[in-house]
Swiss-Prot record:
GO molecular function annotation: small ribosomal subunit rRNA binding; structural constituent of ribosome
Protein name, as recorded: Small ribosomal subunit protein bS20
Similarity section: Belongs to the bacterial ribosomal protein bS20 family.
Cysteine disulfide links: none
Matching Pfam families: Ribosomal_S20p (PF01649)
UniProtKB keywords: Ribonucleoprotein, Ribosomal protein, RNA-binding, rRNA-binding
Function: Binds directly to 16S ribosomal RNA.
Annotated InterPro entries: Ribosomal_bS20, Ribosomal_bS20_sf
Source superkingdom: Bacteria
Any one Gene Ontology cellular component term annotated for this protein: small ribosomal subunit
Matches recorded under NCBIfam families: S20
GO biological process terms, semicolon-separated: translation
Biological source species: Caldanaerobacter subterraneus subsp. tengcongensis (strain DSM 15242 / JCM 11007 / NBRC 100824 / MB4) (Thermoanaerobacter tengcongensis)
């Protein structure tokens, strides 16, 4: 059994024209998916970094943007809806914990 490390190595194995076309499509979609996932991670990271500022309005805006980006990824088929729901739930839990601690102070 041959172990392939990348799509380029698979490209060498493609014999038919349609297989080569499919490989090109896969490359394009893989790149698109990586970009979208990277964007989602960036927005989540920015939200987590903003939690340290304790500025509720700024945090709320970052939360809104992160949720929006997660929803976009779901609509484009990059993330499963349950994955996005789980990530949003964690974000809201952090936000609500911050609100609760802020109201206790």
């Amino acid at each position: 059994m041959v172990k392939l490390n990348s799509i380029e190595e698979v490209d060498l194995l493609a014999n038919t024209k349609s297989a080569k076309k499919r490989i090109a499509i896969i490359k394009k979609r893989t790149l698109r998916n990586k970009m979208i996932k990277s964007r989602v991670k960036t927005f989540i990271r920015r939200f987590n970094e903003s939690l340290a500022t304790k500025d509720i309005e700024a945090i709320k805006e970052r939360l809104r943007l992160a949720v929006k980006e997660l929803d976009k990824a779901v609509s484009k088929g990059v993330l499963h809806k349950n994955t996005a729901a789980r990530k949003k739930s964690k974000l809201y839990a952090k936000f609500n914990a911050l609100l609760k601690s802020a109201s206790n102070e």
